Amino acid sequence: MAPTPLPLEQMSGVGGYLPAGQEGGPRINTMSMSMLIDFIIQRTYHELTVLAELLPRKTDMERKIEIYNYAARTRHLFTRLNALVKWGNSVSKVDKSSQIMSFLDKQNMLFVETADMLARMSRETLVRARLPNFHIPAAVEVLTTGTYNRLPTCIRERIVPADAITPAEKKQTLLRLNQVIQHRLVTGKLLPQMREFRIKNGRVTFEVKHEFSVALTVMGDSQNVPWRLLDIDVLVEDKETGDGKSLVHPLQVNYIHQLIQARLVENPNALSEVYNCLHYFCQSLQLEVLYTQTLRLNYERLDDNNITVEEYVPGVKLTVSYWRDLKSELGYRLTVQSDPSEIGRPLAVVHVPSLGAKESAEVADRAVRSEHLSMERLIVHTVYIRSVSRLSDLKLEFQAFLKDVDFNLQGTPAILTVPVLSPCLRAEQIHITIDTHTGMFRCHVPKHLDCPITDEMQEALNGDRSKLPSLLSELRYWITHRRCEKTLQHLPATATDTLTFLTQPEQELLQQGRHKIYVKLHRHPNIILVVQLKEKSTMANEMEYTFHLGFVAFQKDEADVIDDSAKQLVSVVAQPPSDIPKFFTKLMRLIEFDTFVATHGPGTEVDAEVSPHKRKSTGDILAPPAKQQKTIFPAYFIPELAHVVAMCDEKIPFMNLAQTLSKHNIPHSGLQVEANATSLVLKILALPQPGKSATAAGQQPQQGAASAAGTAPPSGSSAFPRIEPHVWDDLMRRVLSISVRSQTNKNSQVRIWVVEFVFYSTPLQSCHPKEQGSRRTVYLTYEQANHDFSKTVEELLNDWSKIVYLYTLVYDFAEQLRNKRLALCDMLVVKSYSYMNLLLGYGPKKEVSCNIYWSVQSHGFRLTFVGGMSAVNAHSMMRDQLAQHLNQQHSLTQIAQILHETYNPMSSIAKLPVLPFLGIPRPQVPVLSFCMLAQSPCLMRLTYQAVYCLELRFRANRLVSIRDGASSRFERNVIEEFTPIQGLKAFLSKYVDESAAYRGRAPHEDDNPLSPIGMEDNYGGPSSVTGVSAGGSSPFLGAGMRGPQSPRDSGLRFPAPHTPPSSSNPHTPASPHPSAGGGGAAQSHGNFNLTSPPAPHMPHPSPGGLMPSSPLNPQPSPHMVHSPGPNTLYMQSHQDSPFTAMSPANNQWPGSPSMPRPSPRPGQSPEHKSTGGSVVTGGPDRGGSRGTLNRPWAGAVPTLLTHEALETLCRPSPHPNKDINVTDMSPLERFLGCVYMRRQLHRNIQNEESLTALNSTEPGVVLFKVDGLQCQVMLNQMHMQTLHLKITQLPPPPDKPTFQLSPDDLLVIEQYFDTRVAAPPYRPNSLHSICRLLNLPAQVLKDFVQIMRLELKPEFGGDQLKWTVQMCMRMPPSAVPIVPSGNACVVLGRMKILFFLQITKIPFNGKDWKDSPSLVLPIVYDITMNLTQMAERREQVPSPMMTAASTLLRRFSEFNSQQNQCSLFPAITDLLTNLQLATDMPQPPPNQAIGPPVGVGVGVGVGIGVVGSSPNPMMPMQQLQPQVGPQGQVGPGGYPQLGPNPGGPQ
């Protein structure tokens, strides 16, 4: 607002007058804007500073009010300033007018003021104008001389003070006055009480302690000048109730001052008069203070029964009585009084009954004649002296019947301590004191405040003192009981005074009384220790202890009969638990200990007493000195009791164990004390042989136990190793000693048995540094907490069986290890052999380990495998199978060879991933990628995603046979849980090494029959496993064919041939004899050791002539029959497949047709021929014929691979297609993934009505067509690890022209399928998405192809794109949850297409891709309306970036002018070009997380290249507009009308 002009009267200048030169200046009362702003800022800052200083002193509400007022004022002020500044912008024109008006106003005011001033001068000033009369002489004097001497004298005297005396004169006067005072004191009469004085500064100060202080002086040096009283200070104080205030009022002091000053005039003994007056006043004041304190003490803290004021005469005496409860004739009282004989003496204290003069004077000095005047201190000190006197009399009475006892009387208040025992802690002594209020005796024992005897003793002290000796004896026994409890506090025992006897025992010791205690041993509930207590006759304060060991039993009532076995340490017959608890105790036997023997045995100190008059002998020189340092125990600790309890607790378990060993017929040497008395030991002389250790204690033969446990071996073998006599003798010679000791576990504080076996060396030398000596020890531990000693002995025998059984293996293995022909030292190394465990190291660097030990629970050997620093131990997968083989063969040599020969293939198999994956069969069901199932030590099954199964058999000569595990090895049908792997034979044939198949055959072996250790042996080791003959049989040799039962013949299918043998490899040359039907390809199974026909005496038909539908004999005839296959998926493209016809062999195999047979599909090509009729007559065919390798059953025939080939097959390696940038996978996983994807594609074609399956003449090729396109999916025949799509454009019908895709578009689809759909990880839902895209109209598919091209080649987008795009084939978890995660995310329905795009911000300025934000956008394209927009959920709040993308797509659809073309790709291009990233983008909701690209093959920079090449280069971005086939409006949006979409969401 504009400033308000002031009236003229308030303007500057005299009456508004302006000085000359300012008439033309600016108007009055104006100010510059800068100065105004400075003033406002200064005012605001000043108010803020004041506010900050004052606010902390105010309340919270006041602070809020002040802050609000300050904010309102400041806001109002700056609002006015803002309005003024805005107004000032347009004030230029007003300024000129203002200056003119200002000049005119100044001129006007100048005339008006001039007239007013002239009128005022003429009317007021000039009327009274006169010249004054000046004082000329005074002015001249002041101006000339600078002084004024004409002031009157009366004024000078009243105003100007007189001159003061000098300090020297003052000091001289005070010294003279001190001399006068000293002379007056010397010549006068001075009382003795006033001899303490000091003269200083002309005054003398007298001080009487605890009474007063007075200062005097004289006014002259004449003897007649009286003393002048200057100051009086009363020194009497009441520090307890006065609160530091003066006890005398100033008026009282003034009155005394005047009184004494009046008596000093003309008084010859003036100083004596001063003392008498003040002394009487101070003594009266002291008595008044003591009386007041007594009344207050009686009123506030004590009562009339404690202290009472009997008489009080002010200024004379005060009498107080105390201890009124005591029946004293005279009573106890004290009197504080002044001395009547001599008035100058201080207050005196008189005691009744009288105290000594020394004690009475001490009391007075402490309480009255001190600075602290206190009646309480007077009474307390009096009571203390009285207490010491009474306690001294009591001490004399105690000394009469307690001899040689040290009594102690000390402390404040006084305490008399009486020792009860010797030695005795001070806390265990009787503390006797006197109650200060009542004067009664009080006694207690500080350590035992709950002692019931102290009350009786206190009554005896205050009454009949003849009972004190008996009460002291009772207290002595009671404290001894507590000492016993304290001693046993940290021992496994509990002390009690009584036991719950149903009938009182007859022994005199156990009768009622307090002179014994019962000690219950925690670890031995049936044993008690009775401790008898006695006082020594020579020294009553010392105790004697006698120990008795009692055996007790528990009963519930009198009718409960106790067996005599309770008298023994270990009950022979275990008593069953009773429903009724047994509370009562019955003593069975009582044994008295010799206390001296029990406390002076091994483990105790040596008592050496040497007579002082006896000379030391020569033998005593080596003995320890007589004054050896004794162990100092606390007084409450009873070493004899602790030693006996510890001895019982330690020896009773040994006695129980020894009795149990005797019951098990195990000889021992009894309990002994080791050398140097270190511990107790129980020596076992011998242990029985494990197979003969069954006793009458309830043990069963271990063979039966093995059968009961379900681990009984097959017939023909023994469950336990046979212990040869020479092996047992050798072990017995090596056992040096077996010792049993008892120790305490440091961690759990539980007592355990430690059994020490000492052996002499071992038959098997190890490389462990601690196992190089000839003395070997084995320590076994057992718990003692269960009190079951039979169980402990059984556990000892079980551990002994572990040693013996492992020794039987090691004894034979040591001999074979020393045999250099077996070369076992090159296979493994013995890391450790501790008689309980055998640790073998094997592998290339001998870093993986196998631990072998005997398990009592499973009644057999167990194996545990541990990996090394740089390798894992893959044998853990077949741990149970190896253990079963060892328990059947009992040969460590075979185990060593198996471990050595199977290490490499098992390590290769262990490299396969076993992680669970989601989204394989169903999105929420996890499935293992690979699962290893060991069948036997040399037979392993691998399952892939619970669909496919591979059977691996480890052979000799570093060979492995692999076959399809879906084909049964016992029957001719297919296992229901698995699916045959199509193309497995052809894939494995690429890794076959032909030279390795012949390495196992030496030239001289042609004339000799095969050994059971051939390539077809089950284990490829020195021997085969008994009872696993089924592993060597073939599913294609008839239902009656079973392997031999002999453990050495499981690998031989036929008797020894008379023809030269050949390799069992199916790729070796066939024998000259032809197969039945002329179509055999000489395919032999893994269990055929030779290729010649079997002997004619075989109990079953020949596989060459009596198996018309066997997979080993493929028939070229179109009418051949075959057993039903595992799945019809692989046979639908073969018109002459044997699975499409009825099998005539059902009468031979009634259970074989386990799956339905599909009917022949129509439209099969008549040119389709069978490929199984070729006959191999030449040399070895590496892969067999093409038709044979591609047959569905070809994988059931084993294929031999080397260990190196298996390592290549299982080791992760880069993808063959360099354009697919994924994690390294093994070739086997890629092959199985492609086969699985091809199988899922075949099933998808059958389930989708929009896809039409076509017949293919090539095996393993999926051929189908969609609208206008024919698609062919096949494996890459070079490596069979990738799937490829080949699309062919079908010619359009002549009557209906359709939109045609260019060859470049088809190439993009093929490249996208190869790098994004059929790439790892292999997910079938990606196939669903691509199939639904192929089923779209050609115009829409063209735009999707453009998006695929932009994803494959981001550089074709040019520099204008700010985002990269990837099309999602599966639903990512970070997208809006429209479709379940993992499902196919391309959904068709109601002429609309829902798909998901992931866009990623292109980094600029050198940023990394990982820092770029990414979005997953759900896009909906409406085919009918030609509209592209985002799919949104109403119940969810979208993120700002999703909202921005939706706005861009909506704006593009509104302003899109090209209605004759598909809007999908242009809308996506516009979105990638114009979508801006908000700098402060908030966090997205949980279901729309911003992160890196999801899925496989959708990452930025992943798969930039393409598969193959096109003759024409891809079109640039300017040419990516789709070409619309028909011109003109055919349907809405320029598209032909389409029917209902058959490919809706599944």
Curated annotation (Swiss-Prot):
Biased composition (Low complexity): 693-717, 1020-1035, 1061-1075, 1515-1527
Comp. bias regions, Polar residues: 1125-1149
InterPro entries: Med14_C (IPR056877), Med14_N (IPR055122), Med14_RM2 (IPR055113), Med14_RM6 (IPR055114), Med14_RM8 (IPR055107), Mediator_Med14 (IPR013947), RM3_Med14 (IPR056879), RM5_Med14 (IPR056878)
Extent of Pro residues compositional bias: 1093-1102, 1153-1163
GO molecular function: transcription coregulator activity
Pfam families on file: Med14, Med14_C, RM2_Med14, RM3_Med14, RM5_Med14, RM6_Med14, RM8_Med14
Residue pairs linked by disulfide bridges in the UniProt entry: none
GO cellular component, one term: core mediator complex
Single Gene Ontology BP annotation: regulation of transcription by RNA polymerase II
Localisation: Nucleus
Location of the region described as Disordered in the Swiss-Prot/TrEMBL record: 692-717, 1000-1193, 1512-1546
Chain positions of motif LXXLL motif 1: 51-55
Function noted in UniProt: Component of the Mediator complex, a coactivator involved in the regulated transcription of nearly all RNA polymerase II-dependent genes. Mediator functions as a bridge to convey information from gene-specific regulatory proteins to the basal RNA polymerase II transcription machinery. Mediator is recruited to promoters by direct interactions with regulatory proteins and serves as a scaffold for the assembly of a functional preinitiation complex with RNA polymerase II and the general transcription factors.
Entry similarity comment: Belongs to the Mediator complex subunit 14 family.
Subunit and interaction comment: Component of the Mediator complex.
UniProt-recorded name of the protein: Mediator of RNA polymerase II transcription subunit 14
Provenance organism: Drosophila pseudoobscura pseudoobscura
Organism ancestry: Eukaryota, Metazoa, Ecdysozoa, Arthropoda, Hexapoda
Gene that encodes it: MED14
